[in-house]
Amino acid sequence: MSHKLSSIPQVALLFETNEQAHRDILHGVLQYVRIHGPWSLHVAEGRAGEQRLLTLGAWGGSGIIGVIQNRVYAEAVMAADVPAVLIDPVDESQLPHGLLASHSVLASDQRAIGELAAEYFLERGFTSFAFVGEIHAINWSRERGAAFAARIERAGFACGMYGALSVREKRDWVAERQRLSEWLQKLPRPVAVFAAMDARGRQVLDACLTVGLDVPNDVAVLAVDNDELICDSTTPPLSSIELDTGHMGFEAARLLDEAMRHRNKAKRVTRTFPPIKVVTRRSTEAVNIADPLVARALEFIWLNAHTPIGVPDVVAHVKVSRRLLELRFRKAQVGTIQDELQRTRLKRVKAMLAETNLSVTAIAKACGFTSKCYLGKVFREAFGTTMTRYRAERG
């Protein structure tokens, strides 16, 4: 079916797609458009060889989806005078008067993000905590840090807060790195550091490397966005909180579609989206167990459980008798050696079932099980369901 150009909604996307969260928003928008379109989408940031799209009033488009993190984008939305959905806007005090009241607003639940980070570290036995915010102390960064610190303090611990950068430090990472490195060195170790975003988490890792702090054993680092281009390229790989930004993009497109169709009747919506989960990588795989034998055994298990190692391999690595190591495990209240091997493997199995399309045979091999039949039996005993049903329920 053909469409005249004038009949196809012209939608501007006001966000920079060099960030994972923004790319996920775009994917959510595209998913909606594939089902309910067509739309003609215009990425306002521009690409090499094309201009930016900011004179939206003269452009004559139909609607806008914008991540409003600066006044330039905010004023562009105001000038356009078309339906818009705003995502994660900065403080209202920094925006043109009336902007937020005029459009639907979707935002990540910053409090839930900070609390998830705190719970993650508390469950791992940390007693020393710190937060490193975004360099400009933007509102979402402050909210994440405040929620993180509040949850840590409710648990009875203090939380160090890093910030107050100079103008020079905001412009030049090398200028800031020494101060951040020195600050990290002064924290009681082992310390759990929550960074406001993946790019900031990468800088924390760089600062640790500069002064010889071991990650994750001296400093465990968790960030936000789960940008694989960043997280998988750091040393060690960076653990990160995955946000529900794809869903947010889909919902933004749905609300904009409704507003474009029923401009004077569409209901203004305000909604927050909680984070999905923590994606654990090496930067937080610290072993916070006082017993050094148990700590060495756990680290060996976590690093090698994807291979078909058994209890004798763990005992051989620690270089003590099996009886002594099992006794230490019981005293540390972490179950038996075999319990930990199986728990670690099943955790990996569940992640691969939910996040990949690999066959059960391939997953069994990748998680250290000798056969898919044995894995199936163990999985049913542990979770009361089959792997097929578990995967189907997670879509």
Predicted feature locations:
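Bacterial carbohydrate/catabolite-sensing allosteric modules
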Residues: 1-65, 71-317, 322, 326-327, ...
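A secondary-structure capping/hinge motif
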Residues: 329-337, 378-390
